[in-house]
């Protein structure tokens, strides 16, 4: 119980920090942060459920694969 409260507080602090910097994030970075926050929340609610891993739909997998060249190109410009 104590660990769940601590993890929840850490998530709240992390999200508060991200919300103050959220305007600087690109759409893909925001999506990544949201997915990470969902995973942390799932682990805090039910630690045994997080071990299974996130399940993506086929459309999400296809979109992420199709978006790889753009992400790699953007990363190369930095």
UniProtKB/Swiss-Prot annotation:
Kindly list the positions at which Alanine amide occurs in this protein: 75
Q: What are the alphabetically sorted keywords of the record?
A: Amidation, Cleavage on pair of basic residues, Hormone, Neurotransmitter, Secreted, Signal
Where primarily located? Answer: secreted
Q: Which GO terms describe its cellular component?
A: extracellular region; synapse
Tissues in which the UniProt entry reports expression: Expressed in eyestalk tissue and cerebral ganglia.
Q: Which GO terms describe its biological process?
A: chemical synaptic transmission; response to light stimulus
List the Gene Ontology MF annotations in alphabetical order.
hormone activity
Signal sequence span per UniProt?
1-22
| UniProt similarity note | Belongs to the arthropod PDH family.
Q: What is this protein called?
A: Pigment-dispersing hormone peptides
Species, as recorded: Carcinus maenas (Common shore crab)
């Amino acid at each position: 119980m104590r660990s769940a409260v601590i993890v929840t507080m850490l998530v709240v602090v992390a999200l508060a920090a991200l919300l103050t910097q959220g305007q600087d994030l690109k759409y893909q970075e925001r999506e990544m942060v949201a997915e990470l926050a969902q995973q942390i929340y799932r682990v805090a609610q039910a630690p045994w459920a997080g071990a299974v891993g996130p399940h993506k739909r086929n459309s999400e997998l296809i979109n992420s694969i199709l978006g790889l060249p753009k992400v790699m190109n953007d990363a190369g410009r930095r």
